């Protein structure tokens, strides 16, 4: 066999001509320590704060959280068990984004926007940064449209407007999540898209909640973001920002959205865990110094945009769990000072059967009053006064043996109004029904009934108005006011109904 040098030269020449010079420059580092959802890496000299990085061997994503002189502290978004010392980390040159848009409606996702409901992949056309700057004063307009929760005591006394931040605060098992879920259910047909963010909750509780929303037909306009108790602290920390970004898609497209953060106490605990593991200096209650900013930058993203900028709104309902009724602890006081009011739920009221267990004295809405419809304003004004007087007299009446008729009348009215404030879970009411029922309460139509019959009276009155006097409810809904004519019709209808009710059920 003879070797032909000419052929070898030809082959070499063709190979050299076809060679493309490619230099792949990547900023990489090496893992020097890993554990508890945190990794430290050497190298990555040009990485930016909050930039995403990838652990090459496992494909796991992390976020550069601490930039120190000789290493980078990374929070790991996912399972860190496969990551080992000496593994390579590379920069992704982008900050964290999540899929947004209508493709996420009806889905249950994790904080990275990946589906966890087994219904296949999500075809999102758009992505949004998880951390963005809140809209400035110039882009906003005052809150002027109501967000109806369907809960009488809230819509009448602590009204919420679209674009408001209203805190729901109370001990464990006092019905905080129930208020949030009823609010979501009540948005059906009202053009409000909802995002429910579960932070550090039991997966079984979230599954139960999702099935309730499906039953009520509310998942059609709702996205559920879950960072359960089984997920690591990094995912729990990211969750509310991811949920907010999903809600902001609707805000900046001129639509209305509602985001519920359940709950921010566990969020603060997750952030404290990350900060302590990264050796950031602890402050009060071992929380880091910037824990106020942690929540303020999240809640400031809720807004009502001016018409020039689309006129969308993002309403936030953060939830805080207190320990033994202590609303003066660090995180509760922080969030109270950030939000535009709070709904305070009290265990003693809850166990006494007053549900929703809202303490009217400690609850307040700082901007929602401007958003109330005129009809509700008319009935809520005297309702507030009647209940305040009743609560004042109630304590006094326990010690007094004989009461003058005026005091006795106020106590009688107050007891019936408090009974009227009770409401079943998963049964939100339309605002026109609330107006009719409260009108009957404040005008003394319940005063001569037994307290036990108040709820029955309410139920039958709504049925009567829907069946026989639907034009009254329609007028209140359309005019959003209680004109003299409508009021006269409502008065006559209640009187007619009451005489029938007393005949059948007695007083």
Swiss-Prot record:
GO terms for cellular component: plasma membrane; proton-transporting ATP synthase complex. Its EC number is 7.1.2.2. Keywords: ATP synthesis, ATP-binding, Cell inner membrane, Cell membrane, CF(1), Hydrogen ion transport, Ion transport, Membrane, Nucleotide-binding, Translocase, Transport. PROSITE patterns: ATPASE_ALPHA_BETA (PS00152). It is found in: Cell inner membrane. The record marks 363 as: Required for activity. It catalyses: ATP + H2O + 4 H(+)(in) = ADP + phosphate + 5 H(+)(out). Belongs to the ATPase alpha/beta chains family. HAMAP family: ATP_synth_alpha_bact. Produces ATP from ADP in the presence of a proton gradient across the membrane. The alpha chain is a regulatory subunit. F-type ATPases have 2 components, CF(1) - the catalytic core - and CF(0) - the membrane proton channel. CF(1) has five subunits: alpha(3), beta(3), gamma(1), delta(1), epsilon(1). CF(0) has three main subunits: a(1), b(2) and c(9-12). The alpha and beta chains form an alternating ring which encloses part of the gamma chain. CF(1) is attached to CF(0) by a central stalk formed by the gamma and epsilon chains, while a peripheral stalk is formed by the delta and b chains. This is ATP synthase subunit alpha. It comes from Thermosipho africanus (strain TCF52B).
């Amino acid at each position: 066999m003879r070797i032909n040098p000419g052929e070898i030269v030809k082959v070499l020449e063709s190979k050299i001509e076809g060679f493309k010079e490619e230099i792949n420059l990547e900023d990489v580092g090496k893992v020097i320590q890993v554990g508890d959802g945190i990794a430290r890496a050497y190298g990555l000299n040009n990485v930016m704060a909050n930039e995403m990085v990838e652990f090459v061997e496992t494909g796991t994503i992390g976020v550069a959280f601490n930039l120190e002189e000789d290493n980078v502290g990374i929070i790991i978004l996912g399972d860190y068990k496969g990551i080992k010392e000496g593994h390579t980390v590379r920069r992704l040159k982008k900050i964290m984004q999540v899929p947004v848009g209508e493709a996420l409606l009806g889905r249950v996702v994790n904080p990275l926007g990946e589906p966890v409901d087994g219904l296949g992949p999500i075809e999102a056309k758009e992505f949004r940064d998880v951390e963005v700057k809140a809209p400035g004063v110039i882009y906003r307009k005052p809150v002027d449209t109501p967000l109806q929760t369907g809960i009488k005591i809230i819509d009448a006394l602590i009204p919420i407007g679209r674009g408001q931040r209203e805190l729901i605060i109370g001990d464990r098992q006092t019905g905080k999540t129930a208020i949030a879920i009823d609010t979501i259910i009540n948005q059906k047909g009202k053009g409000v898209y909802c995002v429910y963010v579960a932070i550090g909750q039991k997966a079984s509780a979230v599954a139960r909640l999702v099935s309730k929303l499906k039953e009520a037909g509310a998942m059609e306009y709702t996205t559920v973001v879950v960072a359960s108790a089984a997920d690591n602290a990094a995912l729990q920390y990211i969750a509310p920002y991811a949920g907010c970004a999903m809600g902001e898609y609707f805000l900046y497209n001129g639509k209305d959205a509602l985001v519920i953060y359940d709950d921010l106490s566990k969020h603060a605990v997750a952030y404290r865990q990350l900060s302590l593991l990264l050796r950031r200096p602890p402050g009060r209650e071992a929380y880091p110094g910037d824990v106020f900013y942690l929540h303020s930058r999240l809640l400031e993203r809720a807004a009502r945009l001016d018409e020039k900028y689309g006129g969308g709104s993002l309403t936030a309902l953060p939830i805080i769990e207190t320990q033994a009724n202590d609303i003066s602890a660090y995180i509760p006081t922080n969030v109270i000072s950030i939000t535009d009011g709070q709904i305070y739920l009290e265990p003693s009221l809850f166990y006494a059967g007053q549900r929703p267990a809202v303490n009217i004295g400690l609850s307040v809405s700082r901007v929602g009053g401007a958003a109330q419809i005129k009809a509700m304003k008319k009935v809520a004004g005297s309702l507030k006064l009647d209940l305040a007087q009743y609560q004042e007299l109630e304590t006094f009446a326990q010690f007094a043996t004989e009461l003058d008729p005026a005091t006795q009348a106020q106590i009688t009215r107050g007891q019936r109004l408090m009974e009227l404030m009770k409401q079943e879970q998963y049964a939100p009411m339309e605002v026109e029904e609330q107006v009719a029922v409260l009108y009957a309460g404040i005008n003394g139509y319940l005063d001569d009934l037994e307290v036990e019959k108040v709820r029955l009276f309410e139920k039958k009155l709504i049925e009567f108005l829907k069946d026989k006097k639907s034009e009254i409810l329609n007028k209140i809904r359309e005019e959003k006011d209680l004109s003299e004519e409508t009021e006269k019709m409502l008065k006559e209808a209640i009187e007619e109904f009451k005489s029938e009710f007393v005949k059948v059920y007695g007083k």
